[in-house]
């Protein structure tokens, strides 16, 4: 995984370059999704 985050079905993560973006874990792949503004 590119980031050291705790695996969860979905949630929010403070990732450098992706502040407070929604992330979804599919299999072993992290998918960062921009928050709906």
From Swiss-Prot:
GO terms for molecular function: hormone activity. Its main location: secreted. Preoptic area and testis. Keywords: Hormone, Secreted. Residues 1-7, 18-37 form a propeptide. GO terms for cellular component: extracellular region. It is found in: Secreted. Belongs to the GnRH family. Precursor for a gonadotropin regulatory hormone (GNRH) related decapeptide. This is Putative preoptic regulatory factor 1. It comes from Rattus norvegicus (Rat). The lineage of its organism: Eukaryota, Metazoa, Chordata, Craniata, Vertebrata.
């Amino acid at each position: 995984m590119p980031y050291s985050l705790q695996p969860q079905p979905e949630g929010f993560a403070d990732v450098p370059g992706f502040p407070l973006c929604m992330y979804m874990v599919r299999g072993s792949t992290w998918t960062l999704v921009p928050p709906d503004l």
